[in-house]
């Protein structure tokens, strides 16, 4: 793809925008960067672009810039309804994200992983599997390094693994993964999408450009994911935690079984360091992608057994007085909380935060069956209480610290205190990481008697 002399507008000057602008300028494009933040707020990014032939429109956007550019490279956080993007589209301009741009320069087999939950763990583990099996591997996308940084450096790689969000998928045109992994779909981002179906359709775009020589790894236990099999031209490779498959990857009798073209590999799970039903699914997806693209089964098993997981995803913080305290602050939607609840019994659940607009009703069965006490916090607590509070003993707390103290007083030995919010953190905290740290500090502050 020849970029020399092309008029390209880069929208947003965060890390990805800086990398895109730098790459485009090096390719000889005529680059303009626009950001609603002013020069003072962008001192760091501007310093990184010093010396590069880039023009700036800062503190505002100008529709004329969007209409004049041949291509607009937009941050995935900008909604399609933006009047500036609408101006570009009315003028017939190409609007893409960094993932689409970068993919046009990549020749190595590419694994793209999406889903409502589990993307980051699965992406990270898949990268570990390829690297552990001797492949030069790049891991990035919606996590860590922007994909364009691989293109910019010109590094030679054998495999590329990217996490990709629904927002990024909205703008793809030719992006084509060799293996597309769809883990699950549950209600999320309804503050961005007008309907749940719009969100589903955005996720399904991961298959848009696949051909019969590609693979689509689908979690067929999820009825919505299973129903999308007809949207891909790729060969479907199913995965299931609930039933045996003649072809695909599945869980049975304490082991993950991979079956493909007469080959069978068995991966016992007893030595895995990450636990929970959701992690069995994440591991199955990673193994499927890795083995389909040439990984050795024995080396892959060793990598899985060594993998310790990622922070803030159902981590054991402490065991005190026979009670285990788990921090799952990354569980910002109902689907992820479902998987957490399915992993334990005798639960004291701490949940709540900023409401994201979806229904909490899918949790009803698990709350009734497995949750002995539920303690609610944050803006969403009243609605959560209305939808779920009648199913178990339900209390309210003003702060997270109060909730931890209350949980410690209610939970009997052998029980689990699970902080799995089902909501975003922005009503009370800077982000889910600060929320996690506050929970951990509150748990660490408990005395052997169960109170601070």
Curated annotation (Swiss-Prot):
The keyword Heme does not apply. It is found in: Cytoplasm. InterPro entries: Mur-like_cat_sf, Mur_ligase_C, Mur_ligase_C_dom_sf, Mur_ligase_cen, MurD. Gene3D superfamilies: Mur ligase, C-terminal domain (3.90.190.20), Mur-like, catalytic domain (3.40.1190.10), NAD(P)-binding Rossmann-like Domain (3.40.50.720). Its main location: cytoplasm. It comes from the Bacteria. Pathway: Cell wall biogenesis; peptidoglycan biosynthesis. SUPFAM superfamilies: MurCD N-terminal domain, MurD-like peptide ligases, catalytic domain, MurD-like peptide ligases, peptide-binding domain. Disulfide bonds: none annotated. GO terms for biological process: cell division; cell wall organization; peptidoglycan biosynthetic process; regulation of cell shape. The keyword ATP-binding applies. GO terms for cellular component: cytoplasm. Its EC number is 6.3.2.9. Keywords: ATP-binding, Cell cycle, Cell division, Cell shape, Cell wall biogenesis/degradation, Cytoplasm, Ligase, Nucleotide-binding, Peptidoglycan synthesis. It holds the Pfam family MurD-like_N. It catalyses: UDP-N-acetyl-alpha-D-muramoyl-L-alanine + D-glutamate + ATP = UDP-N-acetyl-alpha-D-muramoyl-L-alanyl-D-glutamate + ADP + phosphate + H(+). It is an enzyme of class 6 (ligase). GO terms for molecular function: ATP binding; UDP-N-acetylmuramoylalanine-D-glutamate ligase activity. ATP binds at residues 115-121. Belongs to the MurCDEF family. Cell wall formation. Catalyzes the addition of glutamate to the nucleotide precursor UDP-N-acetylmuramoyl-L-alanine (UMA). HAMAP family: MurD (MF_00639). This is UDP-N-acetylmuramoylalanine--D-glutamate ligase. The gene is murD.
